[in-house]
């Protein structure tokens, strides 16, 4: 994913990369693509997209209600301000993470980050595009 141009709405994706991935999906006989993300509880969750809609979903992402991030590890919806079922964020895929799933017929997956419609962090979950965010895990404090 590349950054969006000033004044545009949302992040932009290289059209050639999208075409290449759609062609790869057809070549690999993929019919469903799982858009995976990790919620604040550390649980991997996702939404599936049919290959017929893959190009548009790779470009614009997949909609996700903010309330999905208020579901705990027991699948209970926790009442948290700002994580109501009204208001949507986007699951924006990292095209380099495309993986054909060998244990599921005709299925692939792609890892996503959660962003607002404008491509910026939406507040509850910081994406890798966050300014000043370290890409390394913090070292544990020495005892």
Task: Identify the function of each model-found stretch.
Residues 1-143:
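ATP/Mg2+-dependent ligation/transfer catalytic cores
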């Amino acid at each position: 994913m590349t950054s969006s141009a000033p004044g545009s709405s949302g992040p932009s994706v290289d059209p050639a990369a999208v075409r290449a991935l759609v062609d790869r999906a057809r070549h690999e006989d993929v019919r469903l693509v799982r858009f995976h993300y990790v919620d604040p509880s550390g649980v991997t969750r996702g939404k599936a997209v049919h290959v017929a809609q893959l190009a548009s979903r790779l470009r614009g992402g997949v909609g996700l209600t903010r309330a999905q991030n208020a579901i705990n590890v027991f699948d209970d919806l926790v009442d948290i301000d700002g994580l109501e079922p009204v208001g949507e964020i986007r699951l924006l895929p990292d095209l380099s993470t495309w993986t054909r799933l060998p244990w599921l017929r005709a299925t692939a997956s792609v890892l996503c980050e959660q962003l607002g419609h404008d491509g910026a962090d939406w507040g509850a979950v910081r994406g890798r595009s966050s300014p000043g965010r370290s890409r390394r895990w913090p070292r544990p404090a020495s005892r």
